[in-house]
Amino acid sequence: MSGHSKWATIKRKKAATDQKRGNLFTKLVKEITIAAKMGGADPGGNPRLRLAIDTARSNSMPMENILRAVKKGTGELEGVTYDEITYEGYGPAGIALIIETATDNRNRTVADIRHIMSRNNGSLGESGSVSWMFHRKGSLDVSKSAVSEDMLLEILLDAGLEDLESDDAIYYTVITDLKDLETVKKALDAAAIPFENARIDMIPENYIELEAEDASKVIRIIDALENNDDVQAVYSNMEISEKAMNSLNE
């Protein structure tokens, strides 16, 4: 919707101002370790690992850190065993939240998540309480300065494009089925069109639009969750009007 920011756009704008590289590296190392443990050390045959390594490299993680994380995942080096647990619940203004974690201590993590939620006018729900509102997809961002919308559609329609969001002023958000994400990346590479932030996303079926006051409360709870080392990703169905987004940035 023109003049509105969906959650992918809001996250991108938040990331531009967040200074959490150490925290980000911790999360990336966990993802690489888990991906290598589940699918092996060869990125060519392990799409999740390939995506995790690409993300780490795009965030300037040293290669030695990446290789060490892979070896911990495969057992070549001793490392921590992580469990992946997804929590669901509601934030302020009834916004649905999905919280993906990787932890070596389930009790600590659930206590921390519950504490963060309750302190910020949120509540944890049962498994399945909000996940039915979302679909797991692949997505990436393409700068609008690199290609027209018509050309991008022409390039990607046969590569697995499901949706193209253009509500952001700077980027298109390309949405695909997870199995088609690599094909879409290759199609963009072949057309010499740069892209950023290829990722696994949870896309809501419908968005809830918030004004600045409620949006700031939701962003506050998401920030608190993302600052927890056990939290890998947070997804929401929040949408903010451009006017409200601008007031938040003032």
Curated annotation (Swiss-Prot):
Subcellular location: Cytoplasm
Paired cysteines (S-S): none
Keywords associated with the record: Cytoplasm, DNA-binding, Transcription, Transcription regulation
CC terms in the record's Gene Ontology section: cytosol
First and last residue of the signal peptide: none
InterPro entries noted in UniProt: Integrase-like_N, TACO1_YebC-like_2nd/3rd_dom, TACO1_YebC_N, Transcrip_reg_TACO1-like, Transcrip_reg_TACO1-like_dom3, YebC-like
BP terms from Gene Ontology: regulation of DNA-templated transcription
One function term, GO molecular function aspect: DNA binding
Entry similarity comment: Belongs to the TACO1 family.
NCBIfam families per record: PRK00110.1, PRK12378.1, YebC/PmpR family DNA-binding transcriptional regulator
Protein name, per record: Probable transcriptional regulatory protein Cpha266_0538
